Amino acid sequence: MENVTHSFVFLAHWPSAGSFGLNTDILATNLINLTVVVGVLIFFGKGVLKDLLDNRKQRILSTIRNSEELRRGTIEQLEKARIRLQKVELEADEYRMNGYSEIEREKANLINATSISLEQLEKSKNETLYFEKQRAMNQVRQRVFQQAVQGALGTLNSCLNTELHFRTIRANIGILGSMEWKRKLN
């Protein structure tokens, strides 16, 4: 603050044209000072600033290149994932369709096998019934025959006496003898 006060004190004592003094025109002074400072900065700082800007530019370009490479890699991975997803979806649809076809085929096979089993079971049942019927009929015939034979034997035993028995034997011997004689003639 003291320097500022001294500056204003010297304003009153402006030296003549050939001497060194204080320029009181603030705008002109700042402009000259700024020009000198900027000139010095440009002269000395130009290389440093250029190197800093070049390094910054190289880092930015390198970051952009890396980002582009990452973007390309990500796009490639995304495309591969999409292709893989499409393949998986197609396989899933194929498995689904094959599964439905296989289920329908197995269902038809099961129905056919069940139908065949039922037909065979029906045939076996009918055969069993037929054989049981035949067996029952044979048993009935056998009982009827046995009863008829027993009845006939009972009737014959009650009707036959010894004399009738001898006559029947002689008649049968005569029939057998005549059959034997005819046979010898032929």
Swiss-Prot record:
Membrane topology type: Single-pass membrane protein
Keyword Phosphoprotein found: no
Annotated Gene Ontology cellular component terms: chloroplast thylakoid membrane; proton-transporting ATP synthase complex
CDD domains: ATP-synt_Fo_b
Subcellular location(s) per record: Plastid, Chloroplast thylakoid membrane
Entry's transmembrane regions: 27-49
GO molecular function, one term: proton-transporting ATP synthase activity, rotational mechanism
Annotated InterPro entries: ATP_synth_b/b'su_bac/chlpt
Keyword Chaperone annotated: no
Residues forming coiled coils: none
Domain of life the protein comes from: Eukaryota
Keywords, ordered alphabetically: ATP synthesis, CF(0), Chloroplast, Hydrogen ion transport, Ion transport, Membrane, Plastid, Thylakoid, Transmembrane, Transmembrane helix, Transport
Additional comment: In plastids the F-type ATPase is also known as CF(1)CF(0).
Family recorded in the similarity comment: Belongs to the ATPase B chain family.
Role description: F(1)F(0) ATP synthase produces ATP from ADP in the presence of a proton or sodium gradient. F-type ATPases consist of two structural domains, F(1) containing the extramembraneous catalytic core and F(0) containing the membrane proton channel, linked together by a central stalk and a peripheral stalk. During catalysis, ATP synthesis in the catalytic domain of F(1) is coupled via a rotary mechanism of the central stalk subunits to proton translocation. Component of the F(0) channel, it forms part of the peripheral stalk, linking F(1) to F(0).
The protein's assembly and partners: F-type ATPases have 2 components, F(1) - the catalytic core - and F(0) - the membrane proton channel. F(1) has five subunits: alpha(3), beta(3), gamma(1), delta(1), epsilon(1). F(0) has four main subunits: a(1), b(1), b'(1) and c(10-14). The alpha and beta chains form an alternating ring which encloses part of the gamma chain. F(1) is attached to F(0) by a central stalk formed by the gamma and epsilon chains, while a peripheral stalk is formed by the delta, b and b' chains.
Identification of the protein by name: ATP synthase subunit b, chloroplastic
Gene (UniProt): atpF
